[in-house]
Amino acid sequence: MWCLLFVVNGGQVVAQSSPLYADQSYLYTPVRLSHGDLERTVRALIDTGCSFCVIDSTFAIDSCGWDRAALAPLHTRAASGARVPVHSGVLERVNFCGTTFIAVKCLVVDLKGKFLHYAPNFIIGENLLSAQPLCIDAPNGRLTVGDVPGENATVLRWQTRESRDGTFTKGIFLKGRVGGKKVRIFLDSGSRYNKVNAALLPDAPRELMELPQADISRRLEVLRVPVCRAVETQVGDYTTRLNFVLTDRPDAVLNFDFLRNTVFVLDYDRREIRIKQ
């Protein structure tokens, strides 16, 4: 996969940037998708929980001119852990944050059929997010390639994990505490909610809430689920308070909520999240 990282402007090398849009717990940025003679610009979801980019199946065929017969069948994992049959294809070009990527592998999924009106047309997965350090400045709505000036207030280092069946690669796993209990945390910016095993918070006040939930294995539905509010959460040396949906899964899941009011650099090469002062 070839990419162009920087442009030269007036003799100076200028890092590329893109607008960043927050919508509840999600972060979006514009990308330009090119396939054959067709070109589309869409608002794409930034998703650290996806190993590969994902394109909605209807959008891929109707708007980007993909040939359904040319798609390759494979399996991937839903957020629930279920093994799900999908397809894959190669998008000729993706321009993401001023960087043009060639021959980008994408999973082709019926996003609109599963997530309904919440579904994006395109999801930016780790195969693009990991190509270069990205500075995410949510307060000012900018996404920039590379680091930014300023001291690091906190550095969060992560580990990765790959599934034996190849359906999941890389991934960001952090060490932390939720409610004072040690836990391994999966950073999934495509998760609508923060989640933690209910057994870690046996005495915490909880309430039942009706929340919309879906993944690529099941259609969107409103479920009545237990929620704990304002739970003290520590990731590395960074401490905050977050709301959690209670589950029976062993790993906690955090989206970008805990970094919402910060400027941070996501660096896959160094396996670091550098929170700036």
What are these regions (language model features)?
Residues G11-Q277:
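Pepsin/retropepsin-fold aspartyl endopeptidases
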Residues M1-N9:
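Bacterial N-terminal signal peptides
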